[in-house]
């Protein structure tokens, strides 16, 4: 995999073809090419979502990267849960099933009572996979974001080993932001940036050092990206991609983790600069509560949110979790194609 490439850019560049990896994934099913017009109707009549099988339940905050031999999915869980697929459709739990066997000791010292690790994000640059993760407790902004790296995701390789580099950024009880839900993007000039945030004063961004993956000493500004003033200030889970002349900031509004009562939904804004300002389709700044809705609930799939984006075979897919009303509200993996209109705005059918 080439240097200086994040998951989004690597997939978008077309380097994720089988030739780019020196492997051939045979027998791949034909993936859907077009979307019907998006609808707000709470009916499950569309055929756009990928028909997934395997280990799909108990998935929160999913993110996918295509590596040397397969697709890998990372999600919230005890030690960061890992799943693997060779075709993007059938998912199997890896063995061992987690990145960590326990919450790192350094994180427990800083966040007493933390029981699990949340909202991972993975990218490849500087010859390593960089997985950012968060540790916190519900309802608190005493939180930390850490970094663990690996030179390969192939567990059969002799080089496979996760190396934890510890603290990247933290937030405190007397602060106005929350250091969880990290997402990395490398801008068009080759500089890495980490966005993060949940509730409080919203989504923030800081510049990273390319060599270390840690905060930059050259630019220490904490840039504000998005904020809400209603629904308890519920905006979180940033994910940024670059497309055409714009950077697109996806976030989740409202409430997760309530089963079929969850009201999570993905919103988006865009900017010509990675640090903003981001505005929605109506021109409302995301720092003023703006956002154009992307995902909608259906009779079956409630609270579709906390997304990542995967570009594969010429299609952008939104990867997220939703709560399955036909399975007692269990959080479940969903992958759906995005369609971009003539004005450069994304949408997805329910």
Residue ranges of model-derived segments:
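Carbohydrate-active catalytic/glycan-binding domains of CAZyme proteins
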Residues: 2-29, 35-350
